[in-house]
């Protein structure tokens, strides 16, 4: 049976924090809001930004939405390209392609931004499915995004012996929690924006400190399935 692997984008495939944080600061400063310290700003990397503005800046929903739209002005033109692919990601994607995984991106970033970024870094050809957030339709949170991606991939989650065939790779608790809830094997990466403690608390099945360790996990799981 064909296996599925889903990747988060920010903090997993690419290091995008420069463009995101500069665009957050741009939006906050435009409206005269206090800009949080760098440690707090790191918490904006992962969840929907409208939620993050409310949680960490004390905004109402309407204020958070207005600030998010201002964020998009800068991020959509400049910020999305203040970004770089993590080392060895291309090798990992090529390995997954060679081993005939169905490969997907499942990101809380707006889908059109995700596609622009993957095109910019010439990564699009590796992916069978790309699913991101859609603010207008209300597709915002990781579980729903992951559910849609799995449905589009079209593969079973388990084989006839109940062994799981779908992996989710991400750097934040949102990735791990959604993966666990939906029956995927959760791989937390510590080189992104979430801490090891956060990923452990979310019950990540594997923790990887670099991209090569993700490949090692896939090889280990393949050996376990063949036994």
Tell what function each PLM region has.
Residues 1-2, 117-227:
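Asp-based, Mg2+/Mn2+-dependent phosphohydrolase catalytic module
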Residues 37-40, 49-52, 113, 145, ...:
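Hydrophobic alpha-helical segments typical of transmembrane helices
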């Amino acid at each position: 049976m064909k296996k599925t692997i889903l990747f988060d984008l920010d903090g997993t495939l690419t290091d995008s924090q420069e463009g995101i944080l500069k665009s957050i600061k741009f939006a906050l400063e435009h409206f005269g809001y206090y800009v949080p310290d760098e440690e707090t700003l790191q918490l904006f990397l992962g969840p929907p930004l409208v939620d993050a503005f409310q949680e960490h800046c004390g905004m109402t929903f309407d204020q958070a939405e207005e600030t998010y739209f201002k964020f998009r002005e800068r991020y959509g033109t400049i910020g999305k390209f203040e970004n770089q692919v993590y080392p060895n990601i291309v090798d990992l994607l090529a390995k997954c392609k060679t081993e005939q995984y169905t490969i997907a991106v499942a990101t809380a970033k707006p889908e059109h931004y995700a596609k622009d970024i993957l095109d910019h870094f010439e990564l699009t050809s590796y992916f069978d499915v790309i699913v991101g957030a859609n603010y207008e339709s209300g597709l915002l949170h990781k579980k729903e995004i992951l559910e849609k991606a799995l449905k589009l991939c079209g593969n079973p989650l388990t084989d006839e012996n109940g062994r799981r065939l779908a992996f989710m790779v991400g750097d934040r608790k949102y990735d791990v929690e959604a993966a666990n809830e939906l029956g995927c094997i959760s791989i937390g990466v510590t080189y992104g924006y979430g801490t090891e403690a956060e990923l452990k608390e979310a019950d990540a099945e594997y923790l990887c400190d670099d991209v090569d360790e993700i490949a090692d996990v896939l090889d280990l799981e393949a050996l376990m399935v063949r036994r």
